[in-house]
Amino acid sequence: VLILSLGCENNQPDQFEKLLGDYDKSRIKFLVVQKVQGDEVEEGMKILHSLYDIASKDVRTECPLSKLRIGLKCGGSDGLSGITANPLVGEFSDFIVAQGGTSILTEVPEMFGAETILMNRCQNEDLFNQTVKLVNDFKEYFLSHGEPVGENPSPGNKAGGISTLEDKALGCTQKCGRAPVSGVLGYGDRLKTTGLNPVSYTHLTLPTNRE
């Protein structure tokens, strides 16, 4: 991994590095652009080539599906994705969870209108309350910035046949299949349990789809 920094951000590389703990310095490199004396791109390419040389010596090893963690994100919703591609992704998610693996559902704003489907699948009352808070906190975030909650569908979504946020939400929740909710992740949380885990963010680390 090559971690790029301009050099003047609030999140400084030396502080960020402390959060990584004990890590393999041969596989994780930092490049601070403002400290490069010559060509930044050339310097970056040198580092990437060194990382490639290390990675090229790696050998694949078998591991059980219980070690697999998958992330479910936006796929560009249209009028058919909720009955075609998304249910197929859901079947795959269910298969991974059934083998002891982990599935992480993102896109909280795209769940608005179908969130009760997830709430009804929570394994216990505590998870139910966490899921309710997950959704309501995002709604409050929208409202606190003067943004309407129901205008998530983009022009591209509408051109493809999506008419309301509820249409999109029913498709979004298909991506996680029928597995019970076994954990709820807040922003920045680490996984604590296998199974299906909705996460309090979108696109795995990016703003929700407005394109």
Predicted feature locations:
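Conserved small/polar residues in nucleotide/adenosyl-binding loops
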Residues: T202-T208
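Non-transmembrane, aqueous-exposed alpha-helical and coiled segments at domain scale
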Residues: G188, T193-Y201
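Acidic, glycine-enriched catalytic cores built around paired aspartates
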Residues: E211
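Buried, small/hydrophobic-residue-enriched core segments of structured protein domains
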Residues: L2-V184
